[in-house]
Amino acid sequence: MGFPMTRKKWCLIGAAVLGLGVAGIATSINPIAERYVAPMVQEQLHNTVRGTIQYDSMHIAWNGDVVLQNVSLRDENDHLVAAVPTMNVSMKWTSAPSILMGNSSGAAIVSTITLEKPDVHVWQLADGSWNVNSLLESSSKNDKKSFDGNIVINDATGAVRFKDGNVHRLSNLDGNIALNVDGMTKGALNGLLDDHSIAVNGSIDMNKMDDFDLFVRAESVDISGIMNMVPSNKNLSITSGILHDVKAQITGRDGKYSMSGNLAFDGVGGTYKNGSTTYQIGQGNGKIFFQNNTVLITHSGWYVN
């Protein structure tokens, strides 16, 4: 005499079968990943970066992803650029046959690199360029395919240092970057800049890194730290102040910057030179609308000595 199967028993059997199936897939993927993929990922990380990458450990997850712990990235001068507690490298398994047959480079198998809680250090060099400009190696002409995967950033912190000594702190930074080492890289990031919200998206030509387009929305920015990026009259020097509700597009072409957008400002101070006379200005406030070299200031007030 048989007994009817209850829904609960069917669910338990289904879960067991599913678990065995997943375990079977994981069992088949892991030996391949251990033998071929882990060394390939290790090689590509070193080949892609001008500098050094070190990590405490590397292991293969159940799904074949490569997981690295306590990763550090240093530039060619051995300066720390990033420290990442956990880096997860996901694969495009459909690219494996092409790579094994020699039709694609090893970089083609990397789909997504996820950085968990990275701490990033970016600084401006004396010539106005940035330490990260030369960090990535372009692929050689013999490569069948360059790296064009996604980089996902979760809960990053960091610092941006300008050549004049100003430092801005980043925190709670999340984003996604579609990286193409030999072409146009696009991305979007949002988080906190000096404890105020900021969102940035745009693109940069990796073959000519002076060519970029950035769109910025910021709640509040200390003006003293960004003046060396803003086109301004040579007779005007701004040394203090806060920008609010910033909406700006910043474009770089051949090392020259142009900006358009609008913002509000207050507490602005500095100097203005008119001929042989220099004026002290302070407590400036108002709104600005700007387009390249055209600037419109409204609802504005200043103290002038």
Residue ranges of model-derived segments:
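N-terminal type II signal-anchor transmembrane helix
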Residues: 2-48
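Beta-propeller and related beta-repeat scaffolds in trafficking/envelope systems
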Residues: 160-182, 190, 209, 234-243, ...
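Short extracytoplasmic
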Residues: 47-70
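Transmembrane beta-strands of outer-membrane beta-barrel pores
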Residues: 117, 157, 193-195, 206, ...
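Short beta-strand segments that buttress and anchor functional surface loops
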Residues: 70-74, 187-194, 298-303
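Secondary-structure transition motifs
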Residues: 51, 70-176, 207, 229-236, ...
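Residues on the solvent-exposed faces and adjacent turns
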Residues: 57, 70, 91-93, 117, ...
